[in-house]
Curated annotation (Swiss-Prot):
Keywords, sorted A to Z: Ribonucleoprotein, Ribosomal protein, RNA-binding, rRNA-binding
Family: Belongs to the universal ribosomal protein uL22 family.
Cellular-component GO terms for this entry: cytosolic large ribosomal subunit
Pfam families the UniProt entry points to: Ribosomal_L22 (PF00237)
Physiological role: This protein binds specifically to 23S rRNA. It makes multiple contacts with different domains of the 23S rRNA in the assembled 50S subunit and ribosome. The globular domain of the protein is located near the polypeptide exit tunnel on the outside of the subunit, while an extended beta-hairpin is found that lines the wall of the exit tunnel in the center of the 70S ribosome.
Organism: Sulfolobus acidocaldarius (strain ATCC 33909 / DSM 639 / JCM 8929 / NBRC 15157 / NCIMB 11770)
Protein encoded by which gene: rpl22
Name of the protein in question: Large ribosomal subunit protein uL22
Length: 156
């Protein structure tokens, strides 16, 4: 089994708060774009942006895995991308992860108003392989793909 390792950052360990969620039932493709959008934001800005996407006031830009994604009129010009979606399931997991990281920062005694998302990434997780029975004694494979998300908050 492989060991989970966070990336090495130049910020001292006592100024960081980390959190990870493993084996969630959300698309890695959606999680990638959510993570890219909020990377480098303050914690409050990221929460506000993600809540706006959940309420469909603002679309989440899709840089990658955007084939067939339609253009949205409510994407901000700062993203320099026209195509976007509203990946609600992925956003709910990311908001839960940000809450966990904020609680970890609070228990470390960090100032919550000055927290910034230093690192956030989505990774492929387990693949659950199952079989669905078909007619005439045949079967079809059925895959369920799981994902991991990790976040590191730093005090600025």
């Amino acid at each position: 089994m492989s060991k989970w390792v966070y990336p090495i950052l130049s910020i001292p360990e006592d100024k960081l708060a980390k959190a990870v969620i493993k084996n969630i039932d959300a698309s890695v493709r959606d999680l990638y774009n959510v993570c890219k959008a909020i990377r480098g934001m303050n914690l409050k800005e990221a929460r506000e942006f993600l809540n706006n996407v959940l309420e469909e006031k603002e679309a989440l830009p899709f840089w990658r895995y955007s084939h067939g994604t339609s253009h949205r009129s409510n994407i901000s010009r700062k993203w320099k991308v026209k195509s976007g979606r509203y990946p609600k399931k992925a956003i709910k997991y990311v908001l839960k992860l940000l809450d966990n990281a904020e609680n970890n920062a609070n228990s470390k005694g960090l100032d919550i108003d000055n927290l910034k998302i230093v690192h956030i990434a989505a990774h492929k997780g387990l693949v659950l392989k199952r079989y669905m029975t078909r007619a005439f004694g045949r079967s079809t494979r059925k895959y369920k793909y799981l994902s991991h998300i990790e976040v590191i908050l730093g005090e600025v």
